[in-house]
Amino acid sequence: MNKSTSIGKLVKKALIDHKQNDMNSALINIMPAIDSTANKEYGGGVGHRIRSFIRKNEALISIIALGCFVILPKFRYPGKTKSVDFADIIYDNIRTYIVHEGEVGEMIEFNHEKKLAISLTKWSLNENYVLAFILCVIVSDKNANEFIAEDVIINLNFGCFSVNDLWGRRLDLLHHIANNSNGQYRVENSNIVLN
């Protein structure tokens, strides 16, 4: 195969945007791929399926973005009637804003450092969160038949990977991370957990 598939094209554009430090454009390109992937995995309404996809991948996202395992608790913002979690914040302030406004919501900003900073009015995510979202699309088992022309190598803390070698290999990536974590993580029930 030498032509990119439809999800492959979105992934390739998002990777190029990420490399050029254009996180807004990277997210504009990857969010439809997240939705399509989540639809294959969960079906149902768009909010449910995207939140479910992010929740399932939250540990992997944090390891890629921060270099460590972080699952954020639910919390309540002033004026909100229910508690929210990481998936709610991403859906409400990235996906929904992109669809309705064409850009990421003001609550989200990106930094070049390996950190996550949260306040009542601002979430500062490092740029590797965007790369993590892209990788979650790539490794979904529902995307095993995807492909990008002119393969890309992704450098992560735990290795270098060809995008075309990663399609649909979520479990393999989780095992690779666990096996290279000096005993910090293990794979359990198709997810990565702390030892």
Model region roles, listed by residue range:
Residues I7, M23-I30, I34, A87-Y91, ...:
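Short runs of predominantly hydrophobic/aromatic residues within well-ordered alpha helices
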Residues M1-L27:
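Charged alpha-helical initiation segments
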Residues K19, D35-Y42, V99, E103:
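Hydrophobic/aromatic-lined pockets within catalytic cores
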Residues E58-Y129, L135-W167:
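Long, charged low-complexity segments
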Residues N157-N195:
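Sequence termini and other peripheral, non-core segments
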Residues G8-V11, R51, D92, T96:
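Hydrophobic core segments within long, regular secondary-structure runs in both alpha-
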Residues I28-I71:
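Short, contiguous, well-structured surface segments enriched in hydrophobic/aromatic residues
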